[in-house]
Structures are given as structure tokens and as C-alpha cells.
Amino acid sequence: MTCYTPRLLTRYREEIVPVLMSRFDINNVHQVPSITKIVVNSGVGDAARDSKIIEGAVSDITLITGQKPRINRAKQSIAKFKLREGQAVGVTATLRGRRMWEFLDRLLTLALPRIRDFRGISDKQFDGHGNYTFGLSEQGIFHEIDQDKIDRVRGMDITVVTTSSSDDMARALLGELGFPFKK
């Protein structure tokens, strides 16, 4: 039986690593920045009023990422938001390994081009440590979600965690991978 390697991972190893090594004058292949994990987070503030809303968020993130997300719960009660301690407030899925590369490939080639009036994502959302976070306003751009079965529009935050120490190296890595940054 042959071992399957995601196509974006193959492209990273064969094409992108040599380009980054020459661009940043890196001698050791292990110093080249790579992606560690991708965190997909969806906050569900209305779950305080209706507990069934969190089930829809769990099913959507499960379909999109291919793994069951963790339910985030409130750490403390906040009366103004009618929030009680222990209530579900969101879902988070952390992708690593093959699932991460497959999700990234689907995101870049299928999902982002389906956004209406899409002009690219901002390249100013790096955190100073080489990690990149951006938000999507609806889950319907993913092919896994059936448009007729959407009960409500849910946005999500996607964080790409890299081994890069600087934003410039991370920006170069993500640009080479195919992230459509605004010019």
C-alpha cells in the first residue's frame, strides 16, 4: 500500500522550501518556516438564548474541517450578556498533519474564490510572531456545506500557526503557498 501525501505538502517540500532557502539565505532545511497547525474557531454568542444553535455550529465545523470540534464554554457569568458560567459560547477545531494540508488546499483553491467580490485577504493581520489570522463571514463558501440546509449564517476565524519567528518570513511562506494577499 502506498502512502498518500497531500498535494500542497508535496508542493511545499519540492518547490517552496528551495525558494525560501534561497530568498532568506537559510542553510539548514529545518530552519525553513513551515505550518504547525490551523485553528478554526467559530463564536456562537446566540447560544446563550438557544442551546440548539451550538449543535448547528458543531455540525458545520465538523463538515468543513473533517473532525469534531471542541465546544468552548464561558469561564464566568456575565449578567449584561445573559451568560452563565459553563454555557457553550463557541466551537474550535485544531488541525494538524494531513488534515491541515488538505483543509488549506480546499480553502485556497475552492473556498476563497467562491466569496463574492473577493479582492484578496489583508496581509496586515500577522501577530508579530509569524502567525496569521483572518475571518470568514459565512460558512456557505465551503463545498461541504449544503446551501439548502443552512439554518443561519455563521462566520469563523482561521488562524495559521507557523514556525517562523518573523512576519516577513511567514508572509513569504503563505504567499508561496498561494494565499491571495491584497496588492
Swiss-Prot record:
Q: Which GO terms describe its cellular component?
A: ribonucleoprotein complex; ribosome
Pfam families reported in the protein's UniProt record: Ribosomal_L5, Ribosomal_L5_C
The record's InterPro entries line, in alphabetical order, gives: Ribosomal_uL5, Ribosomal_uL5_bac-type, Ribosomal_uL5_C, Ribosomal_uL5_dom_sf, Ribosomal_uL5_N
| Any one GO molecular function term | structural constituent of ribosome
Q: Which domain of life is it from?
A: Bacteria
Q: Which UniProt keywords apply?
A: Ribonucleoprotein, Ribosomal protein, RNA-binding, rRNA-binding, tRNA-binding
Listed GO biological process terms = translation
The UniProt similarity line reads: Belongs to the universal ribosomal protein uL5 family.
* Subunit structure as annotated in this protein's UniProt entry: Part of the 50S ribosomal subunit; part of the 5S rRNA/L5/L18/L25 subcomplex. Contacts the 5S rRNA and the P site tRNA. Forms a bridge to the 30S subunit in the 70S ribosome.
This molecule's function is given as: This is one of the proteins that bind and probably mediate the attachment of the 5S RNA into the large ribosomal subunit, where it forms part of the central protuberance. In the 70S ribosome it contacts protein S13 of the 30S subunit (bridge B1b), connecting the 2 subunits; this bridge is implicated in subunit movement. Contacts the P site tRNA; the 5S rRNA and some of its associated proteins might help stabilize positioning of ribosome-bound tRNAs.
This chain belongs to the protein called Large ribosomal subunit protein uL5
Source species of the chain = Tropheryma whipplei (strain Twist) (Whipple's bacillus)
Q: Which gene encodes it?
A: rplE
